[in-house]
Amino acid sequence: MKTNRPNMLALLLQDFFACHLPSLRGMSPNTIQSYRDSLVLLLRFLASHKKRPASSLDLGDLGAQEVQSFLVYLEQERNNSGSTRNIRLSAIHSFFRFVAAQHPDRLEHAQRILGIPFKKTCSRVIDYLEYDEIQKILSIIDRSTPKGRRDYTLLATMFNTGARVQEIVDLRARDLQLTKPFQLHLMGKGRKQRCCPIWPQTVQLLRRLCLELQIDLGSEVRIFQNCRTTPLTRFGVRYILKKCLEQAQVHIPSLQCKRLHPHSMRHSTAIALLKSGVDLSTISQWLGHSNLNTTNRYATIDLDMKRKAIESVKPVRDQRARTTPWRHDHTILEWLEAL
């Protein structure tokens, strides 16, 4: 008689998502959701490929060949970029590292999948907002309405802190330090906390917003809320920024050539700090980067800074270059042979 007992794959997936990722790895809900989406796509692909319901799939159905076929499917049929393909593969790798630890007898199986390499991708040019562009965008916002005041405070805080979108929407009243030294307490990736200094102007904006919403400082209430007084989501922030950019494009044509999104505000903060002479190590701590190499990319972005650096250095004058060497020889071949 058939039983409905879960197979090994089902049990491993349950332990991976219910215990390993949130408790042992301490991953954020967004990362867990990304991993879940990746494995759901994989299981659906396998179910379609093997013409079987996903509930009947077991660990033996998920080999290196199947994973490679899945990665090809992502790029060729779903038109995913190499970066998205690598994100999906990262989730699969994480799951099979867990499989290897839980079942050493499956180590060879796991190693074959862990041996599938990430694809080398072309890094895109990072689009960011210049300081003048940000000032213009903020000036267009109608601050005579509660929604306008919220949007202004939201974008100003994002530019001041360079915080990730999730860090902004997670910001609670207790995370605000609106007495000197002014700063925000942010919860970053990997649940790493950091303090970020804020300008007096940002302090005033946050104070007014809390007063208007009747939020008690020190409480657990989220600072940025929608019209239903529920916390803004990442998608809500994206919508607000998109709306503000569309309004600003009429006055700032240069915005039409840029691919901008909420993370662009973070890039804009980094470039503004770099232009102000702040060193990369400080910028790395400001943004909450765990690796300085992540911050180093900003040093290669701003072409104006490169031009100014070149202009500030006088080229070395080569006195010998004033005469062409081979003119003293009978032929150019003789000169080349003498090298």
Task: Go through each PLM region and give its residues.
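Conserved catalytic core of the tyrosine transesterase superfamily
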Residues: 1-339
